[in-house]
Amino acid sequence: MPDNMPEEQAHPTRCGFVALIGAPNVGKSTLVNALVGSKVTIVSRKVQTTRALIRGIVVEGNAQIVLVDTPGIFTPKRRLDRAMVSTAWSGAHDADMVCVLLDARAGLDEEAEAIFTKLEAVKHPKFLVINKIDLVAREKLLALAQRANERIAFRETFMVAALSGDGVDDLRRALAAAMPEGPYLYPEDQMSDAPLRHLAAEITREKIYRNLHQELPYQSTVETESWKEMRNGSVRIEQTIFVERDSQRKIVLGKGGATIKAIGADARKEIAEIVGQPVHLFLFVKVRDNWGDDPERYREMGLEFPKE
């Protein structure tokens, strides 16, 4: 190699998009956060918590990896469900490569088999990522990996426990090596392409999931209405939680406002950690009839409105 060769030519940068595909609750959002090293996407035990495409951005060596956390793929019933599943598959087709996640405990169940069948139409290189390996015996993991590779021609197979971080570094390095040559698309210190207003709304939505255990969270959405930087270095945030019926509004508020206070306290603490400054969070709960059938709400969530 010539001594006068510029460093950027000696080590050309790489950059590409990686779509994470899998059934609900296989751990896609947890894996994105583990790969990035920071929380960029909502995590909950409840299914269907990721609604739109959220991108986490990782720099590993000379490569920038743009991770696309897609909604979980399942059999859609409602209009919102159809939009989420359609968005997930569009993310797979548009990416440079695909990471297919399997839950080690569930294995190749009916949902996974349906995803594998549709994956045959996706021509990009594919990695198989078996998650939650700490919960399953080694023999079962090896058998699952063999069965999956007999179904789909995966370039590589990885065993990870996203929650603890086990195996995540190996996956990150392999993704970096697989990225095509090209310039970085984002600043090196940027961890997500989602604006802070959106991340703050996602955090509050996560706290709704954690504080309420009925079907209600799937019939609610959060919008950041106001974000004001204060002279004392703090930030004042106003958010509205929209529900479809007045009975749902009462559930979110809770007896004596206890539930909304708990949601607000949890959300405020986490938003403050992300923005690195004190946060004054004000939550309002409003009824918006049939918001799940409003095209404008879909655009706000980054989803395409299904016509049928």
From Swiss-Prot:
Residues covered by region (G4): 131-134
Region: G1, residue numbers: 22-29
GO molecular-function term, one example from the UniProt record: small ribosomal subunit rRNA binding
Similarity remark: Belongs to the TRAFAC class TrmE-Era-EngA-EngB-Septin-like GTPase superfamily. Era GTPase family.
Domain of life where this protein originates: Bacteria
Oligomeric form and interacting partners: Monomer.
PANTHER family reported for this sequence: GTPASE ERA (PTHR42698), GTPASE ERA, MITOCHONDRIAL (PTHR42698:SF1)
Ranges of residues in domain KH type-2: 212-289
Gene Ontology BP, a term: ribosomal small subunit assembly
PROSITE patterns, A to Z: G_ERA (PS51713), KH_TYPE_2 (PS50823)
Record region (G5): 160-162
UniProt-annotated binding residues for GTP: 22-29, 69-73, 131-134
Topology of the protein relative to the lipid bilayer: Peripheral membrane protein
Compartment list: Cytoplasm; Cell inner membrane
Era-type G domain residues: 14-181
Function statement: An essential GTPase that binds both GDP and GTP, with rapid nucleotide exchange. Plays a role in 16S rRNA processing and 30S ribosomal subunit biogenesis and possibly also in cell cycle regulation and energy metabolism.
Chain residue ranges for the region called G3: 69-72
Protein name (Swiss-Prot/TrEMBL): GTPase Era
